[in-house]
């Protein structure tokens, strides 16, 4: 991770943001002073860019994590121009429709929030299952089950999203997989 954004702009740290640096960012956020500028003062090899968004930085992977529509069409063009390889939508609807269209048109690996965020929903489901069965799984058991669920989601996206040229349209795959799951459940219940 080389960038972190806030309402005041973003920081770029070519040395990477990990360990003590993440702890410092968490301290900044916990203080109620939700800004990132002090990071550049504490870590002088980093740069603070006021009033801008991190999508102009050359990166291999972009992860919109904060709010809906935080990555727009112009941001997508910057990422594409800078040869981004993969975009993973961590926040719900982190990318605008224009950004998504640009990623798909350029055949980039774009993982939509409905597939990426499924891990959180799945973990909640696993927790409810444990509670209902009055059981307690180890962290490793939960992690193994979560990996299995996420692998299955990926396989469904590949199954339904692979285009004739081999490009995997994860949006299409996730949408069709979601539809198929609901349709099969309705048929199993005799609704359709």
Give residue ranges: language-model regions.
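Glycine-rich phosphate/diphosphate-binding loop of Rossmann-like nucleotide-binding domains
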Residues: 1-58
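Short acidic, glycine/serine/threonine-rich loops at helix termini
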Residues: 6, 13-23, 75, 98-100, ...
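Structural motif
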Residues: 1-3, 46-47, 60-61, 84-87, ...
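Short, well-ordered coil/turn residues at beta-beta hairpins
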Residues: 63-65, 90
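Beta-loop-alpha module in the N-terminal Rossmann-like domain of NAD(P)-dependent dehydrogenases
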Residues: 66-74, 94-97
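Adenosine-phosphate binding glycine-rich loop
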Residues: 78-192
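Flexible, active-site-adjacent loop/turn segments at secondary-structure boundaries
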Residues: 9, 15, 20-23, 69, ...
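Rossmann-fold NAD(P) dinucleotide-binding segment
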Residues: 48-61, 69-85
